[in-house]
Each structure stands twice: as structure tokens, then as C-alpha cells.
């Protein structure tokens, strides 16, 4: 029996499955877009934005619902009746226009035979004055406008999130590039250590230290590569797309203005406009509660057909025209409580608006300080990187000349790796801070030159 062949055959199938599954994940489709293409796709496909669009459309339909209370109502009704009730029986025959002399016989009046009636009616009612309907229409228009402003703010948020994701992707790509440099340099250090050991100029322990340093650099590269993939997948999720999304260009550089310009722009931020409308609607809600004190005036009319034998029959027909006034003189103090409640709600909305404006002002101030901090830290990290590069170069020269031990070179390399990572992070923080300030002031679409 060929045990070797059997072992290979047993291993072959699992290895094929592993290879197919592995390549399926490794070569999953990756979309490649420009930054502006990514923003455009996000504005079209993002699920949160689609939900907000549906909410805005639903609010717009609410205007039609409110307007319908001011329009005429037309009602068609077909009703069947069979009765021996004396009053109903007599009036039904009267509606059918078939009253005869014997129907006035007391015995017939008191004990009528069963009467059938198919009643067909078409009625119309038109409000002439309805205070609640008028105020409700104004409020529904305001609510629709507020939802539209919220939708535009949501678009700004999505654009901001795409810019954030793009900057994050750029940062982790730079970090991955730095780890690749670190691996290449660690490989070179190991080569030098092995050469020196082979020539009897170094110790075997130096090669072990260099190999350990290489392993650590490779681990950092693996983590950095994972971060790149996660950033791409996160961007794909934000864009509402399957798989990873990579960008083939950089995020546009946003201009940095004076803080006064950002504070001025924030006064017309979309969510501020929305809350201003909500606050105005809350005040109108007081008028809506007070509308209960006003009468409801309307006119109406109806055309009716009655037949003892068939639906839609017209053995007897009649019409009527009405004008009416309905006035709730007392409703158990319900209107008073509704009015008081509406006043408190209006005060709540006004306080929410004031809080939002102050919060925005604080965030703009904070974001501006963060920019100054990030810019200073970026400059410091750039100088630190230059120092680390020069320091490592000098240590390597001295190590190759036998003046420094390997541990000094590895320490210098570790400092350089840290300086690279720190500078990459500080650059990302600076650009992220500018994008955040643009978003907080409500001008990110303008800065990115994107039409809402």
C-alpha cells in the first residue's frame, strides 16, 4: 500500500479548498474611485441619507394632507334598510315617493308590513372657515421646509464622513509605506550584522537582535496592511457599496479662513435653519391650540335616491343644501391645557435653538484651536523626523565602522520608525482638523466645491 500517495491525496483536497477560499477573499472586487466620485456615490447610495430623503418626502406629503382639510369632501353611500319600525317604515315610503291613502290608516301606521329600501346618496361638504385647518397648513409647510434643511445638513455630514474616511485611508496608507521602509531597513540591518559576524567583526547575538527587530517590523507591517484594508472597507460601507473602495487621488486641500468667517457662516448652518423653523412652528402650535375657540363654518349639499327593489334605483329622489356653524363652547377645559402645553413646547424649542447656536460657536472655537495645535505638532514632528533620519544615518555609519554596537543602531531605527509614524499621524490630524472646522461652520460643500 502506497502510504505516501495516500497521504498526499488526503492533503490535496483540503489544500485546494483552502486555496480557493483564500483567493476568494484575497481577490474580492475592489472599486477604485476618485474623491469626488466617492462623494457623488455616497450622496446617491448612502442608506442613512436615503432614509432622510424618505423622511423629507413624507413630510412634503404632509402638506397635501393638511391642505385636504380645506378642500371639499365628496361622499358616496349605498345603504340597505329593511324595517317594521312604524316611524322608519312610513318615512321610508315617503322618501320613495309611494305614499298612498291607505298608508294613513292607524292600523297600517302602527303595524306596518316590512319595508325595504336601497338608499343611494351623494353628499358634498366644503369648509368656509376652519382656523385649525389654516394654521395646520402653515405648520405642515414649515415642517416640510425644516425636513429639507435637515436633509441638506445630512448631505453635508455624509460629505464630511467621506472626507474623513478618505483622510484616514491616506494616513493608514502612509503608515503602511512607513512600515515597508522599516522592514526594508531591518532587512538591511540583518544583512550587515550577518556580514560582520561572518567576517569575525561582530557577535552572533547581533544577528539575533537584528532578526528580532526584523520580525517586529514585519508584525507592524501586517497590522498596517490590515488597517488599510479596514479603511477601504469602511469607505465602501459609507458609500453603500459592496467590498473595498480605494481612492486614486488625494482629498482636496481646503482653504483656512479667519475664525470670524466661520462664525458668520455658522449662523446660516442648515440645522440652525431647521431649528429656527421648528421654533417658529412651536409658536404656531399655540395658535393651533387657540383655534379651538373659533367656530367651524361650512356649506354642504346632498342628492338622495330611494328604491324598494334595487341598488342605485330612483323610485324616489330628493336633494338638500345646507349651511352650518359648529362651535365648541365648552370641552372640559381641554383647549386651556392644550394652549398651556403649546406655550411650554415653544419655550423648549427656543431653548434648544439657543443651546444649538452656543454649541456650534464652541465647536468652531475648539476646532480652530485644534487646527493651531495640529499645525504646531505637525511642524514639530517634521523636525523630529529629520533629526531621527540624520541620527540614524550617523549611528549606522559609526556601526559599520565598528564604533557603535548594533543595539545603538536598532534604537536609532526604532526612534526613526516612531518619528515616521508620529509625523504621518500629525499630518492626518491637521488635515482632519481643517475638514472638521469646515463641517462645523456649515460650508464643507462650498469648500469641496460640491453642489448639494
Each model region followed by its residue ranges:
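Periplasmic alpha-helical coiled-coil/stalk elements that build and connect Gram-negative outer-membrane
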Residues: 2-3, 33, 155-267, 367-370, ...
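Bacterial N-terminal signal peptides
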Residues: 12-23
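Acidic, low-complexity, intrinsically disordered peripheral segments
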Residues: 27, 82-87, 422-452
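Amphipathic alpha-helical coiled-coil scaffold segments and their short linker/junction regions
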Residues: 39-43, 94-107, 241-302, 447-452
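Small/polar (Gly/Ser/Thr/Ala-rich) solvent-exposed segments
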Residues: 50, 73-88, 110-114, 125-153, ...
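Amphipathic alpha-helical coiled-coil segments
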Residues: 51-66, 154, 158-179, 188, ...
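Transmembrane beta-barrel architecture of outer-membrane proteins
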Residues: 117-121, 164, 209, 296, ...
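Membrane-embedded beta-strand positions in outer-membrane beta-barrel channels/transporters
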Residues: 121-123, 166, 298, 322-324, ...
Amino acid at each position: 500500500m502506497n502510504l505516501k500517495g495516500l497521504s498526499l491525496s488526503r492533503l490535496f483536497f483540503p489544500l485546494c479548498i483552502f486555496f480557493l477560499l483564500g483567493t476568494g477573499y484575497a481577490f474580492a472586487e475592489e472599486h477604485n474611485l476618485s474623491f469626488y466620485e466617492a462623494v457623488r456615490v455616497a450622496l446617491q447610495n448612502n442608506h442613512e441619507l436615503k432614509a432622510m430623503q424618505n423622511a423629507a418626502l413624507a413630510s412634503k406629503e404632509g402638506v397635501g394632507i393638511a391642505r385636504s382639510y380645506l378642500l371639499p369632501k365628496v361622499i358616496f353611500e349605498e345603504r340597505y334598510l329593511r324595517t317594521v319600525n312604524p316611524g322608519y317604515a312610513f318615512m321610508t315610503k315617503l322618501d320613495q315617493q309611494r305614499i298612498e291613502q291607505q298608508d294613513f290608516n292607524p292600523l297600517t301606521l302602527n303595524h306596518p308590513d316590512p319595508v325595504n329600501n336601497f338608499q343611494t346618496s351623494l353628499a358634498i361638504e366644503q369648509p368656509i372657515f376652519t382656523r385649525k385647518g389654516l394654521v395646520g397648513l402653515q405648520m405642515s409647510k414649515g415642517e416640510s421646509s425644516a425636513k429639507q434643511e435637515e436633509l441638506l445638513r445630512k448631505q453635508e455630514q455624509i460629505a464630511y464622513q467621506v472626507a474623513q474616511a478618505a483622510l484616514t485611508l491616506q494616513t493608514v496608507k502612509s503608515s503602511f509605506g512607513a512600515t515597508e521602509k522599516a522592514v526594508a531597513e531591518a532587512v538591511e540591518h540583518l544583512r550587515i550584522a550577518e556580514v560582520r559576524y561572518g567576517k569575525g567583526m561582530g557577535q552572533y547575538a547581533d544577528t539575533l537582535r537584528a532578526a528580532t527587530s526584523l520580525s517586529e517590523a514585519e508584525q507592524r507591517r501586517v497590522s498596517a496592511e490590515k488597517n488599510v484594508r479596514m479603511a477601504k472597507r469602511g469607505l465602501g460601507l459609507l458609500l453603500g457599496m459592496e467590498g473595498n473602495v480605494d481612492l486614486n487621488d488625494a482629498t482636496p486641500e481646503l482653504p483656512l479662513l479667519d475664525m470670524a468667517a466661520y462664525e458668520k457662516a455658522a449662523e446660516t448652518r442648515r440645522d440652525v435653519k431647521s431649528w429656527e423653523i421648528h421654533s417658529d412652528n412651536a409658536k404656531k402650535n399655540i395658535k393651533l391650540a387657540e383655534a379651538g375657540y373659533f367656530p367651524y363654518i361650512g356649506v354642504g349639499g346632498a342628492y338622495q335616491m330611494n328604491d324598494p327593489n334595487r341598488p342605485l334605483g330612483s323610485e324616489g329622489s330628493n336633494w338638500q343644501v345646507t349651511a352650518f356653524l359648529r362651535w365648541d363652547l365648552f370641552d372640559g377645559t381641554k383647549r386651556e391645557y392644550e394652549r398651556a402645553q403649546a406655550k411650554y413646547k415653544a419655550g423648549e424649542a427656543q431653548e434648544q435653538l439657543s443651546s444649538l447656536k452656543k454649541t456650534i460657536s464652541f465647536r468652531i472655537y475648539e476646532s480652530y484651536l485644534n487646527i493651531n495645535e495640529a499645525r504646531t505638532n505637525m511642524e514639530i514632528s517634521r523636525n523630529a523626523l529629520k533629526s531621527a533620519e540624520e541620527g540614524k544615518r550617523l549611528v549606522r555609519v559609526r556601526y559599520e565602522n565598528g564604533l557603535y554596537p548594533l543595539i545603538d543602531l536598532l534604537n536609532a531605527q526604532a526612534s526613526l520608525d516612531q518619528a515616521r509614524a508620529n509625523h504621518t499621524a500629525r499630518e492626518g490630524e491637521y488635515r482632519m482638523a481643517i475638514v472638521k472646522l469646515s463641517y462645523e461652520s456649515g460650508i464643507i460643500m462650498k469648500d469641496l466645491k460640491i453642489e448639494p
